[in-house]
Amino acid sequence: MKVVAFERQEQGTGASRRLRNAGKTTGIVYGGEAAPQKIELDHNALWHALKKEAFHSSILDLEVAGQSQQVLLRDVQYHPFKQLVLHVDFQRVDAKKKLHTKVPLHFLNAEVSPAVKLSSAVVSHVATEIEIECLPSALPEFLEVDLSKIEAGQSLHAKDIALPKGVALVAHIDAENPVVASATIPAGAVSDAAGEGETPAA
């Protein structure tokens, strides 16, 4: 995805306010061997781009003053109650160095799982994203979590996710192996099932 930005000359709270009034959002690009670079972006274009999942988890081509560089979106600051982006941070990407970043999880096939079809269980998505490490060229936009075999009372963990070639869980996630999805039978369904099994009193 391509992002167009402009070099920002003015600094300070007053300058940021003037830029916002002009429909601009402030930002910064950092990382790599180059010095941090202050930028400004068109607010409306940025606002719509931020609605796309891929904008948060893909390598972006950021063009500033005619020069293109590969970056990752690292932070977004929103106004507390207005539909307003106050500031964005981008980190430069080195094609030869592994990066650590979070990618979204897409859950598939819960409706055909034994948990749902046989036990009327509810499958809960405990995590919506997970932190991985890989070279920029191997970065996936998202990871798929196949729920087709989950049974009632079972959980799927981080290590159960099929990872593409060149992608690994970061060390602490690999060690902790957290739950990403679980299948539970609602309390009401358990009570109903127990009631159906009771023998009526004589």
From Swiss-Prot:
The keyword Cell membrane does not apply. GO terms for biological process: translation. It holds the Pfam family Ribosomal_TL5_C. Keywords: Ribonucleoprotein, Ribosomal protein, RNA-binding, rRNA-binding. SUPFAM superfamilies: Ribosomal protein L25-like. GO terms for cellular component: cytosolic large ribosomal subunit. The keyword Zinc does not apply. One of its GO terms (molecular function) is structural constituent of ribosome. HAMAP family: Ribosomal_bL25 (MF_01336), Ribosomal_bL25_CTC (MF_01334). Part of the 50S ribosomal subunit; part of the 5S rRNA/L5/L18/L25 subcomplex. Contacts the 5S rRNA. Binds to the 5S rRNA independently of L5 and L18. Belongs to the bacterial ribosomal protein bL25 family. CTC subfamily. This is one of the proteins that binds to the 5S RNA in the ribosome where it forms part of the central protuberance. This is Large ribosomal subunit protein bL25. The gene is rplY.
